[in-house]
UniProtKB/Swiss-Prot annotation:
Belongs to the GHMP kinase family. GalK subfamily. GO terms for cellular component: cytosol. Substrate binds at E34, H35, T36, D37, Y223. It comes from the Bacteria. SUPFAM superfamilies: GHMP Kinase, C-terminal domain, Ribosomal protein S5 domain 2-like. This is Galactokinase. The lineage of its organism: Bacteria, Pseudomonadati, Pseudomonadota, Gammaproteobacteria, Aeromonadales. The gene is galK. Catalyzes the transfer of the gamma-phosphate of ATP to D-galactose to form alpha-D-galactose-1-phosphate (Gal-1-P). The active site is at D174. Keywords: ATP-binding, Carbohydrate metabolism, Cytoplasm, Galactose metabolism, Kinase, Magnesium, Metal-binding, Nucleotide-binding, Transferase. Its EC number is 2.7.1.6. GO terms for biological process: galactose metabolic process. It comes from Tolumonas auensis (strain DSM 9187 / NBRC 110442 / TA 4). The record marks R28 as: Transition state stabilizer. It catalyses: alpha-D-galactose + ATP = alpha-D-galactose 1-phosphate + ADP + H(+).
Length: 384
C-alpha cells in the first residue's frame, strides 16, 4: 500500500469523507558539506524518494485535527485562537504545533484543517524525517489557504519550529532541500544567503544510503562542543563565521601559536570542506565520478581526523564501500556523526554487488547489521 493510499484510508475512517488535497515533502541525504551549515558555508544535499505525506481537508473553524497514521492513529487537536503550547506526551505533535504556531506569528490568515500524516523516511538515520514533517505541514497550510509562501519561507518556518518549539538547534539545510529539491538534481546551498544552484546529477548514477545501526551516544553534547570550537575560531579572526576565513589565514595563525591545536583542526575541516563542496558540485555536473569519489574520501578523512566525529564501525563501512565501488563513485559518512549513515554514489549496475558485499563484510567486521536504501534524487515538497 502506498503512503497516499494509507493516508486516504485512514482519512476516510477518521473523518468519514474524502480529503481536499494531498501534499508531500521528502527526506534528504547530504552528498557532501558536513558541519558547514552553521558556519555559514556550503552544502550539497539531494531530496530522496522517502517522504512524509499529508491528506487534508479545510475546516470552517479554527480547529486543527491531526491523525498520525504511523502512531496507531493517535490524534491531536488544538485551536488557532488559543496560545499553542507543547504537547506533553506526543512528541510528533510538537513538530506540527510548532510549524502552525510560527505561521500564525507571521500574521498569516489561517483556518483549521483536518489532516492525516504518514511517512516512510527512516527515523533516527539522519535522513531528516523531522524536517520532512515540518515542511509537509507548512506546505499543507500554504496550499490549502493560498498563503503564497516560497519554498525558502516554508523551510525557514520549519527550522524556526524545530529550533524554538521542539528545541533542536538545527541549521537550515534539511528544511531547505525538502522544500526546494528537484528530481535528478542535487542542490548547492549557500547557508548564508540561502541562494541555491541546481546541480544536474548524471543519469547513470545511483544513490545508496547505508545505515550503520551504530547506537549513537553523545551526539548532542559533541555537536555543541564542535559548534563552540568553530565559533571560537571565528571570534579569533573577528569574523561572523568560518566561511570568512581562508586556509592561508588559518595556517598562519596556527604557525604563530595563536590557536589551540584542536580548534585549528576543527576550523581546518570546515574551511576545506567548503572548498570540497564547491568542487563537488562541478564534478557532479560534469559527470566526473572519479573526482567526486576523491572529494568524498577527503571529506570522510577530514571528518575522521580533523573534526573527530566518525566511529570505527562507520570508518569500516566507508572502507568496504570504497573498495567495492572503485573509481566510479565514492562513499563518506553523512550527517552529524558518531553513527548514522554512509552515503555512496555509484553506477546502477554496481548496486546489487555492492549491497551484497556490505551485507557480508560489515557484520563480519563489526558485529552490526547494515540497512541499505537505494534512492533517487527527487522533487521537493508540493501537491500530488
Amino acid at each position: 500500500m502506498s503512503l497516499k493510499e494509507k493516508v486516504h484510508a485512514v482519512f476516510q475512517n477518521s473523518f468519514g469523507c474524502e480529503p481536499d488535497l494531498y501534499v508531500r515533502a521528502p527526506g534528504r541525504v547530504n552528498l557532501i558539506g558536513e558541519h558547514t551549515d552553521y558556519n555559514d558555508g556550503f552544502v550539497l544535499p539531494c531530496a530522496i524518494d522517502y517522504e512524509t505525506v499529508v491528506a487534508l481537508q479545510r475546516r470552517d473553524d479554527d480547529k486543527v485535527v491531526v491523525v498520525a497514521a504511523d502512531y496507531a492513529n493517535q490524534r491531536d487537536e488544538f485551536s488557532l485562537s488559543q496560545p499553542i503550547e507543547a504537547h506533553a506526551d506526543q512528541l510528533w505533535s510538537n513538530y506540527i504545533r510548532g510549524v502552525v504556531k510560527y505561521l500564525l506569528e507571521k500574521g498569516l490568515s489561517l483556518k483549521g484543517l483536518n489532516m492525516v500524516v504518514s511517512g516512510n523516511v527512516p527515523q533516527g538515520a539522519g535522513l531528516s524525517s523531522s524536517a520532512s514533517l515540518e515542511v509537509a505541514i507548512g506546505q499543507a497550510f500554504n496550499d490549502a489557504y493560498q498563503l503564497g509562501l516560497t519554498p525558502a519561507a516554508i523551510a525557514l518556518n520549519g527550522q524556526e519550529a524545530e529550533n524554538k518549539f521542539v528545541g533542536c538547534n538545527c541549521g537550515i539545510m534539511d528544511q531547505m532541500i525538502s522544500a526546494s529539491g528537484e528530481k535528478d538534481h542535487a542542490l548547492l546551498l549557500d547557508c548564508r544567503s540561502l541562494q541555491t544552484r541546481l546541480v544536474k546529477m548524471p543519469d547513470d548514477l545511483a544513490v545508496l544510503i547505508v545505515h550503520s545501526n551504530v547506537k549513537r551516544g553523545l551526539v548532542d553534547s559533541e555537536y555543541n562542543t564542535r559548534r563552540a570550537q568553530c565559533e571560537s575560531a571565528a571570534r579569533y579572526f573577528g569574523v561572523k563565521a568560518l566561511r570568512d576565513v581562508t586556509l592561508e589565514q588559518l595556517q598562519q595563525a596556527a604557525e604563530q601559536g595563536k590557536l589551540e591545536p584542536v580548534v585549528y583542526q576543527r576550523a581546518r575541516h570546515v574551511i576545506t570542506e567548503n572548498e570540497r563542496t564547491l568542487a563537488a558540485a562541478d564534478a557532479l555536473e560534469t559527470g566526473d565520478l572519479e573526482k567526486m569519489g576523491v572529494l568524498m574520501a577527503e571529506s570522510h578523512n577530514s571528518m575522521r581526523d580533523d573534526f573527530a566525529i566518525t566511529v570505527p564501525a562507520i570508518d569500516t563501512l566507508v572502507e568496504i564501500l570504497q573498495q567495492h565501488i572503485g573509481n566510479d563513485g565514492g562513499a563518506r559518512m553523512t550527517g552529524g556523526g558518531f553513527g548514522g549513515c554512509v552515503v555512496a554514489l555509484l553506477r546502477p549496475a554496481q548496486v546489487d554487488d555492492v549491497i551484497a558485499a556490505v551485507e557480508a563484510e560489515y557484520p563480519a567486521k563489526t558485529g552490526l547489521k547494515p540497512t541499505c536504501y537505494v534512492c533517487k534524487a527527487s522533487d521537493g515538497a508540493g501537491i500530488f
